[in-house]
Design a protein with these regions (language model features):
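N-terminal Rossmann NAD(P)H-binding glycine-rich loop of SDR-like oxidoreductase domains
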Residues: 3-23
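NAD(P)H-binding glycine-rich loop region in Rossmannoid oxidoreductase-like domains
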Residues: 50-89
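Short alpha-helical oligomerization interface
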Residues: 78-93, 126-134
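Conserved Rossmann-fold NAD(P)-dependent oxidoreductase catalytic core, especially the SDR/UDP-sugar
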Residues: 95-137
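Conserved beta-loop-beta element that borders a ligand/cofactor-binding pocket
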Residues: 113-114, 146-172
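Glycine/proline-rich active-site loop of Rossmann-fold NAD(P)-dependent oxidoreductases
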Residues: 143, 156, 169-183, 210-211, ...
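A conserved pocket-lining segment of Rossmann-fold NAD(P)-dependent short-chain dehydrogenase/reductase
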Residues: 162-175, 184-208, 212
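C-terminal substrate-binding subdomain of Rossmann-fold SDR/epimerase-dehydratase oxidoreductases
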Residues: 198-201, 206-328
Length: 328
């Protein structure tokens, strides 16, 4: 199977490429950035702009992929600073990808949407098919992208599928997302021994560890289309408060100092999002099930972070954590 990834240099794409290669796919990457030094052999990299129709069309025509994983996007916090750029990248880029798929016979497009697609005031857990009235440009473009994909599916028969990701957590440092505070508790906690989060201690949103997120994309892509009743699916794994995350980090990094100082703009965005998602359709229609809870995520994440840090301020105490859990 041949797969093209847009936004391949981002937080999701960086980790998704080796997963797809391990499943036997031939992978081509499409990103405005240069190819990273860590790029696996055999992976093609195209330095292209998703907002330029001709560049997208040429890449799809040349590569002839069976599927496109459309990951390119400007995230929530960055999108509020540059809303016109967010519209161009997220909306025009999505239109270019869908039109290229139509023109050159791509079978499937996988789309990544977000909890930011939902607006404030919805009762938790937020269902899969509720009204979406987002309060950020990022959310607006993702809702529009979902609808555009539905249009191409209905009018042209494109196999359009997607997930609404919660806040994604990985060892790759994020850029421009409102849920970045979670990753920075782990990264800066190990690297510097301290971190001041830009949210309140009681802040709570749905989260997911990156290995679960990557598996969800691949499993949805490979799911039997006859079972699917939706195009877009809510998915989540855990919904801890910010201070509960801090406690999990502190248990593993003795002496770490984690504090909270709410930034009004980012807090406003965060407070407009759901605290929990109802993802029953994903469970029922393609057997979605997360594997990582807060403890499992914290153990794996700090193992990866501390392994790459040359001189971490605080060493990860894996044995102490394992012993404290007992056999439960």
């Amino acid at each position: 199977m041949k797969i093209l990834l847009t936004g391949a240099g981002g937080q999701v794409g960086t980790d998704l490429v080796p997963i797809l290669l391990a499943r036997g796919a031939k992978v081509a990457c499409f990103d405005l950035a240069k190819a990273p030094a860590s790029l696996q052999s055999g992976v093609e990299w195209r330095e292209r702009d998703v907002t330029v129709p001709g560049e997208v069309y040429d890449a799809v025509k040349e590569w002839k992929p069976d599927a496109i994983y459309h990951l390119a996007a400007i995230l929530s916090a960055s999108g509020e600073k540059k809303p016109h750029t967010a519209w161009r990248v997220n909306m025009e880029g999505t239109l270019n990808v869908l039109e290229a798929a139509r023109l050159f016979g791509v079978r499937q497009v996988l789309f990544t949407s977000t909890i930011a697609a939902f607006g404030p005031g919805l009762p938790d857990p937020v269902g899969n098919d509720v009204s979406m009235r987002p309060s950020t440009m990022y959310g607006v473009t993702k809702v529009a992208g979902e609808l555009l994909g539905e249009y191409y599916a209905t009018k042209y028969g494109l196999d359009f599928r997607g997930v609404r990701f919660p806040g994604l957590i990985s060892a790759v440092e994020p850029h421009g997302g409102t849920s970045d505070y979670v990753v920075y508790m782990y990264v800066h906690g190990a690297r510097h021994g301290a971190y001041e989060s830009f949210v309140r201690a009681d802040s709570k949103i749905p989260l997911m560890y990156m290995p679960d997120a990557l598996r969800a994309l691949v499993e949805l892509s490979e799911a039997d289309g006859k079972r699917l009743k939706h195009r877009m699916y809510n998915i989540q794994a855990l919904s801890p408060r910010a201070d509960e995350i801090a406690a999990a980090v502190a248990k593993r990094l003795p002496g770490v100092r984690l504090t909270f100082q709410s930034d009004p703009e980012r807090q406003k965005i965060l407070d407009s999002w759901p605290q929990e998602l109802d993802d029953r359709p994903a469970h029922e229609e393609w057997d979605w099930a997360p594997k990582f809870d807060l403890d499992a995520m914290s153990d794996d994440l700090l193992t990866k972070i501390c392994a790459r840090e040359p001189n971490p301020k605080i060493a990860y105490r894996a044995r102490a954590v394992s012993a404290s859990r007992g056999t439960a």
